[in-house]
């Protein structure tokens, strides 16, 4: 397999860290973006670590193209996200707004900044959640998280349509219920989740661009 340049946001822990690990093991070059690095990420020795990268801070990500020099990205993975549990009683407007900024607007800003650094035939990956599916909402609550992920899905579909003439495909993937800090340790292993995600990334093309898939290959409803 030809060595690829892969840029991953939120790569210091959880799914982002495991994506970094597995792509490096395949011989790819990985550019790791995070607000603060971790000993685990440093131990993996990615191609570059860009620390101090806050997807909400335009100034912190504005110079990414120049920092990448002439490197062109094959795969951009928007993984950074936040979940703040809520219900009607605990609903906090600021928390809802924060989740919209991080989960929906943040990835869009990253794409805008890095558009000139993408190869002509590149892949944009958005790690979303089936909790952003309106049709699949069987339990309610999590207002801010659900709404922010639904917004991310809408953004990703628009990008799929806007960027298809350039040969850029867009993957909208649910990683499954994964045992991470965000899920309280409940769910499948991070390794299993990422193995499935990589299969979805490898099979992504312009024909299935803009569709919503579970890491196990199941197409999910909007």
What do the PLM-derived regions correspond to, one by one?
Residues 8-9, 78-79, 123-129, 169-174:
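Structural signature of the Rossmann-like NAD(P)-dependent dehydrogenase/reductase core
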Residues 26-41:
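Conserved glycine-rich Rossmann-like NAD(P)H-binding loop of the short-chain dehydrogenase/reductase
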Residues 172-175, 180, 184-222:
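C-terminal helical subdomain
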């Amino acid at each position: 397999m030809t060595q690829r340049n892969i840029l991953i946001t939120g790569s210091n822990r959880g799914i982002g860290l495991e994506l970094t690990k597995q792509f490096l093991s395949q011989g790819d070059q990985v550019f790791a973006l995070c607000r603060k690095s971790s000993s685990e990420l440093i131990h993996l020795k990615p191609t570059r670590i860009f620390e101090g990268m806050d997807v909400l801070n335009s100034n912190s990500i504005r110079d990414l193209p120049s920092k990448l020099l002439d490197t062109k990205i094959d795969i951009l993975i928007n993984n950074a996200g936040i979940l703040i549990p809520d219900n009607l009683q605990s609903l906090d407007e600021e928390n809802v707004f924060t989740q919209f900024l991080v989960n929906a607007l943040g990835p869009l800003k990253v794409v805008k900044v890095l558009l000139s650094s993408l190869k002509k035939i590149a892949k944009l990956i958005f790690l979303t959640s089936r909790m952003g599916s309106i049709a699949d909402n069987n339990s309610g609550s999590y207002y801010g998280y659900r709404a922010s992920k639904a917004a991310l899905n809408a953004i990703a579909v628009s990008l799929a349509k806007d960027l298809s003439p350039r040969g850029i495909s867009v993957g909208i993937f649910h990683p499954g219920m994964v045992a991470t800090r965000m899920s309280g340790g409940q769910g499948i292993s991070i390794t299993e989740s990422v193995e499935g995600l990589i299969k979805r990334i490898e099979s992504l093309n312009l024909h299935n661009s803009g569709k919503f898939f579970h890491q196990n290959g199941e197409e999910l409803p909007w």
